[in-house]
């Protein structure tokens, strides 16, 4: 049994081997790389040709074409009752477009939206969405039909003017292109993303496009600049303003370009004696509600300042009215510039004139777009004329037969009466009067009423008209220039019927209309405060009146426990502000970019402005009127290290920040001061020691350097400040208990770097710790802020200049539990400049 089984197994193996060999003979070995490439290209071309790109001739993608043809087939013309959108979508899906219903309905909705299409192709009834991005109602609720304009796309389609191809299941045919009496691609544009390419064609004004086409027909050697005399530029359904003509020229010349779009704004006076910016037209594609929310967010973040209120008063009657109400005294142009910069009130439209030409994607310039449309119309009118000619000849042929019958009516009647049947009568008539089969059949079908003399006259007149029409058609086909004349006449009628005024305004170069924000900013001194929790604000320094030494001051913020003003300084709104953190990170910004708020406001979080790490703290700052890359600064750390560096290393810091100093463990950056060549620099410690050194003795270093030793400190001492000393300036010191004094800089001798320094104050329980040391001129003023956010402004010369060992005098009266948190200098030259 075992032997028999082995023989059977061997037989099966041989059969399997033979079968495998036969299969392998029929297997083609191909490269997977080539197969992937070819399959992907096949798929890509299918997407490009069958879905994503418009045909240059009728300007439609397949889905648009199928929707219009399905409506035409269902007789949904502009003068017929509306029909449920679901019915049209169902027809399109069942007969022509085997894709999702959402894609078809979404396309049909867009064809009915007056903010999406320059010239509507679908007349919708019901909720078809809004410019606020509200979704349309479901297709079972809405109704639609073709617009009169869309019907022009299908004119003469029944006259064999375009090629029909089988649909997806070969059950019927559909047009491969529409006759398109109107230049749809130019007037409505197109958008689509294919595989590896995209089209983004803007809409245009019908009158302008028609005028350009007419000019091209008369001057086919015209250059693009000649055509641009008629087509000024895109014309968007949402209107708006197009800034600059260079992008338009580039797009019309090369097929690609970028244009800048802006909303149309008007400035109105409100009932509360404020100015309001009213948005009346939006850039194409901008959603109003999204824009509204974006502006509100930017106002909250402090990126847009001076806005009191934002509200939407848009309606069907009033149109778009987005109101941006400004605060009193705010420069409107500054707010406008901020809106242009940060919101979609200004956008860019990238033009890509990509369309299918003979089934292949091609980027087209303006002249080519016009040329291919004219070529298509020539072909359509030629085929239409040939069809009309054949129909006219066929009808004339029949009428000629009827006239022969009427001329020989007695004999015709006799032949019919004597004939055995219809076929015999037809044959006899054909032989007797030399008629064709169609003529003979027409005579047999002719009713008796046509035998009257009046009917004979009508037939003769109709035949004469047909002969004239035949002559016209033959002449038209023999003279191509006459076909072009027909195209011109039809286009002019289209323009008269549907043409309207331009909506989008085109004005000159953007640079000609932009106003430099810096030129519009009021140059004034402002007091800038930063709280312990990182809230920043600016208020006019003039809002703090000058008081006598020893006063209480006025409320300068909203202190809450440990949340109080920690830093205070005065600067011009046009100054550059450099901010440094304890970790040695540097930022810079313009002072006017700091949110302008009331004195009692706590401010805006600085994290909305600067890219600060969670535990990072601001420890020092300075301002300069000009950004001079060669300007030197000196940085001082808590452990007495100093470093000199040029501002050029911080040029890229801006609001994202950059590391300005490499710190050792447990060290912190505490002070930064700009210095000029020849200045002296003084470092002060918490224990009351000051070291004066010469700036020239400190070498400049790169951004990554850690610095060098500046002052020697006792174990329990730390460095608290560092200031450049200019001629005529003295030091001003203030402690946390409000005790302070001025010291002449002459009291401090110039020492070498690394020394211990000289006493400038002896802190004790009465004075409290040293809070701030600054340099001040006799004519300057100072501002002192306390932890309960009281601020006092006094003249510097009201504080006596005392010796190094003197304790000082009372500068500010402090309430119980409060202490001084910072001191700011208001330079006299700023007051004079203001």
Curated annotation (Swiss-Prot):
What sort of enzyme, by top EC class, is this? isomerase
Name the chain's protein.
Answer: DNA gyrase subunit A
Q: What Enzyme Commission number(s) does the record list for this chain?
A: 5.6.2.2
Annotated organism of origin: Brachyspira hyodysenteriae (strain ATCC 49526 / WA1)
> Miscellaneous notes for this chain?
Few gyrases are as efficient as E.coli at forming negative supercoils. Not all organisms have 2 type II topoisomerases; in organisms with a single type II topoisomerase this enzyme also has to decatenate newly replicated chromosomes.
Which residues, if any, are the signal sequence?
A: none
Name the domain of life: Bacteria
Q: What does this protein do?
A: A type II topoisomerase that negatively supercoils closed circular double-stranded (ds) DNA in an ATP-dependent manner to modulate DNA topology and maintain chromosomes in an underwound state. Negative supercoiling favors strand separation, and DNA replication, transcription, recombination and repair, all of which involve strand separation. Also able to catalyze the interconversion of other topological isomers of dsDNA rings, including catenanes and knotted rings. Type II topoisomerases break and join 2 DNA strands simultaneously in an ATP-dependent manner.
How does this polypeptide assemble, per the annotation?
A: Heterotetramer, composed of two GyrA and two GyrB chains. In the heterotetramer, GyrA contains the active site tyrosine that forms a transient covalent intermediate with DNA, while GyrB binds cofactors and catalyzes ATP hydrolysis.
Q: Which SMART domains match?
A: TOP4c
Cell location: Cytoplasm
CDD domains, per database record: TOP4c (cd00187)
According to its UniProt record, which reaction does this protein catalyse? ATP-dependent breakage, passage and rejoining of double-stranded DNA
């Amino acid at each position: 049994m075992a032997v028999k089984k082995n023989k059977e197994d061997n037989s099966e193996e041989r059969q399997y081997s033979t079968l495998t060999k036969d299969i392998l003979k029929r297997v083609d070995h191909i490269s997977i790389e080539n197969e992937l490439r070819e399959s992907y290209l096949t798929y890509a071309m299918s997407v490009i040709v069958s879905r994503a790109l418009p045909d240059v001739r009728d300007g439609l993608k397949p889905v648009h074409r199928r929707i219009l043809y399905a409506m035409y087939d269902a007789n949904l013309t502009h003068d017929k009752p509306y029909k449920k959108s679901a019915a049209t979508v169902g027809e399109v899906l069942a007969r022509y477009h085997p894709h999702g219903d959402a894609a078809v309905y979404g396309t049909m909705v867009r064809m009915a939206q007056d903010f999406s299409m320059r010239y509507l192709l679908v007349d919708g009834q019901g909720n078809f969405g809004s410019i606020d991005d509200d979704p349309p109602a479901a297709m079972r609720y809405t109704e639609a039909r073709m617009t009169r304009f869309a019907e022009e796309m299908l004119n003469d389609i029944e006259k064999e003017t375009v090629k029909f191809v089988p649909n997806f299941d070969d059950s019927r045919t559909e047009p491969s292109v529409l006759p398109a009496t109107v230049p749809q691609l130019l007037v409505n544009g197109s958008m689509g993303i294919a595989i590896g390419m995209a089209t983004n064609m803007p809409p245009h004004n019908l009158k302008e496009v028609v005028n350009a086409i007419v000019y091209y027909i008369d001057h086919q050697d015209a250059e693009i600049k000649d055509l641009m005399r008629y087509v000024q530029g895109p014309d968007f359904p949402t209107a708006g303003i197009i800034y600059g003509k260079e992008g338009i020229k580039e797009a019309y010349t090369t097929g690609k370009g970028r244009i800048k779009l802006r909303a149309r704004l008007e400035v109105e006076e409100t009932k509360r004696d404020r100015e309001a910016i009213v948005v009346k037209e939006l850039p194409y594609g901008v959603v109003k509600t999204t824009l509204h929310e974006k502006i509100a967010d930017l106002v909250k973040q402090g990126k847009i300042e001076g806005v009191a209120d934002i509200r939407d008063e848009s309606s069907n009657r009033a149109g778009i009215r987005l109101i941006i109400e400004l605060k009193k005294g705010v420069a409107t142009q500054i707010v406008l510039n901020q809106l242009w910069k940060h919101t979609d009130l200004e956008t860019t439209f990238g033009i890509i004139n990509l369309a299918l030409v003979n089934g292949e994607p091609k980027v087209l310039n303006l002249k080519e777009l016009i040329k291919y449309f004219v070529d298509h119309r020539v072909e359509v009118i030629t085929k239409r004329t040939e069809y009309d000619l054949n129909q006219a000849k066929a009808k004339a042929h029949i009428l000629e037969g009827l006239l022969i019958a009427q001329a020989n009516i007695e004999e015709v009647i006799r032949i019919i009466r004597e004939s055995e049947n219809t076929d015999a009568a037809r044959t006899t008539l054909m032989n007797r009067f030399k008629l064709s089969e169609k003529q003979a059949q027409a005579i047999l079908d002719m009713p008796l009423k046509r035998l009257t003399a009046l009917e004979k006259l009508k037939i003769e007149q109709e035949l004469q008209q047909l002969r004239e029409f035949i002559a016209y058609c033959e002449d038209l086909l023999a003279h191509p220039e006459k076909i072009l004349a027909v195209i011109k006449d039809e286009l002019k009628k289209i323009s008269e019927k549907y043409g309207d005024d331009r909506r989008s305004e085109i004005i000159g170069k953007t640079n000609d209309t932009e106003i430099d924000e810096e030129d519009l900013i009021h140059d004034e001194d402002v007091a800038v405060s930063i709280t312990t929790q990182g809230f920043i604000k600016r208020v006019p320094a003039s809002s703090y009146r000058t008081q006598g030494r020893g006063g209480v001051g006025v409320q300068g913020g909203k202190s809450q426990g440990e949340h109080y003003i920690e830093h205070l300084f005065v600067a011009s709104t046009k100054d550059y502000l450099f901010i440094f953190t304890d970790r040695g990170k540097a930022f810079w910004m313009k002072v006017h970019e700091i949110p302008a708020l009331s004195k009692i406001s706590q401010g805006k979080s600085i994290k909305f402005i600067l890219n600060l790490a969670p535990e990072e703290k601001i420890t020092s700052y300075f301002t300069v009127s000009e950004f001079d890359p060669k300007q030197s600064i000196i940085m001082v750390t808590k452990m007495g290290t100093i470093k000199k560096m040029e501002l050029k290393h911080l040029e890229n810091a801006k609001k994202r920040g950059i590391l300005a100093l490499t710190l050792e463990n447990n060290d912190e950056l505490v002070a930064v001061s700009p210095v000029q060549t020849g200045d002296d620099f003084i470092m002060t410690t918490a224990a009351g020691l000051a070291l004066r050194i010469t700036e020239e003795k400190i070498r400049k270093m790169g951004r990554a350097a850690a610095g060098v030793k500046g002052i020697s400190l006792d174990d329990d001492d730390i460095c608290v400040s560092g200031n450049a000393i200019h001629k005529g300036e003295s030091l001003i010191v203030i402690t946390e208990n409000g005790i302070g004094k001025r010291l002449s800089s002459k009291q401090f001798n110039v020492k070498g770097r690394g020394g211990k320094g000289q006493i400038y104050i002896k802190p004790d329980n009465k004075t409290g710790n040293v809070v701030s040391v600054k340099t001040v001129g006799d004519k300057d003023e100072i501002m002192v802020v306390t932890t309960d956010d009281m601020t006092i402004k006094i003249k510097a010369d009201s504080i006596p200049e005392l010796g190094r060992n003197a304790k000082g005098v009372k500068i500010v009266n402090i309430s119980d539990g409060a202490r001084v948190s910072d001191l700011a200098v208001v330079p006299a030259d700023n007051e004079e400049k203001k």
